[in-house]
């Protein structure tokens, strides 16, 4: 899923299809991050993670950009340790607050996965970025400009 703290800058967050010493693979699950983060809907609008619920449709992407719709089967909010991760694409800077856990992975530009617990300054991960514009209730407003920090 594309997830980020800004509507115009989102990180490709991988599902939990890779097991760890703590858990079995759970390919149906995406640990998306803090509830204030945005995700991209199949219709091109954004939604806050806090707005998602069972039955909500979200956009699922692979590392090559191929997208499909998926319906949420279960949505849960938990209190967990979190990390702030920032990145830059051109002149745009974006961030995400993600759970501090080895099972949370981003996708590198070569298609390989990297856990947020192993990210290092200078690592390159896949992200969606475009010039900032205004949004109102998730819909892009073409004649507005908003600077988010």
Which functions belong to the PLM regions below?
Residues 1-31, 83, 87:
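Active-site loop ensemble at the mouth of alpha/beta enzyme cores that anchors a bound cofactor
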Residues 27-40, 92-109, 147:
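Short, basic/aromatic beta-hairpin or loop at an interaction surface
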Residues 44, 57, 63-64, 124, ...:
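Short, surface-exposed secondary-structure boundary micro-motifs
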Residues 45-48, 115:
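Short, conserved secondary-structure segments in the cores of folded domains
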Residues 49-53, 119:
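Short, well-ordered loop/turn sites that connect or cap secondary structure elements
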Residues 50-51, 60-61, 67-72, 82-84, ...:
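Extended hydrophobic-aromatic, low-complexity segments
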Residues 66-87, 137-149:
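Short, compositionally biased
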Residues 84-136:
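Glycine- and charge-enriched low-complexity intrinsically disordered segments
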């Amino acid at each position: 899923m594309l997830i980020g703290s800004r509507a115009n800058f989102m990180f490709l967050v991988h599902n939990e299809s890779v097991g760890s010493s703590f858990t079995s693979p759970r390919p149906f699950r995406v640990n998306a991050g803090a509830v204030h983060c945005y995700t991209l809907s199949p219709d091109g609008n954004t939604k806050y993670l806090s707005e998602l619920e069972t039955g909500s449709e979200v956009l699922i992407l692979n590392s090559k950009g191929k997208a499909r719709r998926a319906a949420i089967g279960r949505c849960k909010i938990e209190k967990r340790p979190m990390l702030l991760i920032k990145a830059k694409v051109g002149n745009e800077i974006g961030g995400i607050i993600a759970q501090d856990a080895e099972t949370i992975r981003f996708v590198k530009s070569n298609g390989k996965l990297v856990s947020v617990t192993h990210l290092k300054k200078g690592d390159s991960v896949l992200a969606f970025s475009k010039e900032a514009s205004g949004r109102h209730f998730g819909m892009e407003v073409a004649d507005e400009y908003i600077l988010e920090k």
